[in-house]
Amino acid sequence: MATQKSVDELKKAHALLAELDYEKRPVERGYANRTLYINLSDNTIETKPVTEQMKTLFTGGRGFGLWLLYQAIDDETKWNDPQNEIVIANGPICGIVSYPGSGKSTVVTVSPLTKSIIDSNAGGYFAPYLKFSGFDALEIQGKAEEDVIIVIDGDEGKVTVETAPLEDLDSHLIGPQLTEMYAIDERDKRGVSVVST
């Protein structure tokens, strides 16, 4: 676990590459009604609306992930092309504690192994926190020139892309580092979720 001094050093080494302030709004009938798009090649961040067509035909989760990926790629897109996306999406019952498994997110991308579109799911807190932050899906496209982190602060209504030059590269180490870095205090650590590749 990182010490407070080392966390301060890590944060001090960050440079802000992109920032988006957004209006927080409530989830309606299971939908936040927008997605978050981040392009790491040109450091752009924007929100996109969730249309009635998306909700009717694709519901959420895997459907949203596939829809968003299909809109971004073409038949020639390879797994390591900047055009490929990693899409993390949640469904309309995500975050409802009455249903087991409602904390799942679906990840959709072009696979390096099969060279075809794949989806996988993961549990944890990220999907509900993404929903409660105001987004039904997160699209990450492009290739960063250096190691970066994406911070979605649902309490403040802010998304940032920051350089991360000193952080550990191993997922089991960077998770606790980032939790320590972005939690306000010990109690707030429960409100931080880290996804890493």
Model feature map: region roles:
Residues 1-197:
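N-terminal export/ancillary region detector
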